[in-house]
Structures are given as structure tokens and as C-alpha cells.
Amino acid sequence: MFRLKSVCVSRNVNAFYRSFASRNNVLFVLGAPGSGKGKHSDHLVAKFGGCHVSVGEILRETVKTPGKYTEMIQKHMNEGTLVPTEVTMELIRDKVMNSTNGVLLLDGYPRNMSNYKTWCDVMGDSCNVLGCLLYKCSYEFLEKRLIARGKDSGRADDNLEVIKRRFYSYEHETKEVLDKLREKYSIEEICTEPPFEEAFPNSVKAYCKIIKQNGLM
């Protein structure tokens, strides 16, 4: 499977890419678990350059090595609940601040109002939020996709009990932050129930629309 995680692709092909050289332009990428945020983000970065920082991947990588947050993060992952905001921000802050080449796709953040308020406090002066890509599928469709993924990946958070808790958390915590984001930013919705080859062109259109709205293309 084609995957790029928390990686920057440097492209100085034209003025579009050079215009980002010293700026932190961030595009939030949200959606329920299994909605395709990561795969679409990887392919957008491959097409347009920039960076993809996946909060979920950072957390999964963090628990592989013993450290001060390992047990706590693993517990939240096993239970399908959100890691405390201050921990998540500590883990992603440097990656976001050091990613100044192109648009940074921040995958899986902010997930709740605590995330968003902390973002505004810590990153608000140094990052320019362009908008949000919102990936959408029915929960029934996502449940089947995640169960199938769990058989291949062995991920602890891809079993039915945890999946349902993750959906509940997304439905009850992320809706509020999406309403808040809509007050300030453009949110482009992409349905990812069709096969990737059919859905990805809509990702490209949504991405380009937000970039153009910000005068960057």
C-alpha cells in the first residue's frame, strides 16, 4: 500500500511551491476513523508537495518506544478515547513548526474544542490555517472497512468494541469543533465511500478550491 507518514516532499518546481518557503500554512484534515484521511493526504502531498503530519501515526509510533507517555497513550488507544490535548500538542508542535515547505496537511487535529483552543493559544500566531478537508462516510460503511483493516493491520483500535467508542467520540466531540471551524474557515466535504480512484479527484478539487480561496494558487 502506498503510504507516506509525517514526511515532507520538497518541490521547487514553480512559484506556487516557492511562495510557501518561509510560511506555516496548515490545512486541517478531519473525518471519522477509517474515512481515508491518511491515504488521501498522502496522495495530495505526492501530487502537490508539502507535508503530511498524521496525529494517529505519531501516537502509534510513540507507543512503540518506552517513554513517559507510552502507557497512557496506549490505554487511550485501547479504549478508543482521545489522548489529552496537552500531550498531543507536545508531540505534534515541533513537526508542525518545522514543516515550512508547502501546505502542511494536519491529519486528525483538532478533534475537539480543547484541541482547537490549545491550537489557537500555542500555534495561532505562527501558523496560517487555510481551511479544512472533511472526509465523510456512513458509520455502517466505516465499520465494515475498519473491521477488514484490523484483520490485516492488527491495530488494537480496529476491533468492533473500540470502533464503536471511537465513532461515539467523533460524533459527540468533533461536531462542536467543526461548527466552530465553519465560523472562520472554508470546510470542503469529500465522500470516500466510492473506490479511492473515484474519490481522489474530489479531494484534489477540494484542496485546490481552498488553496485558491487563500490566494496561493
PLM segments and residue spans:
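Glycine-rich phosphate-binding loop of ATP-dependent small-molecule kinases
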Residues: 1-217
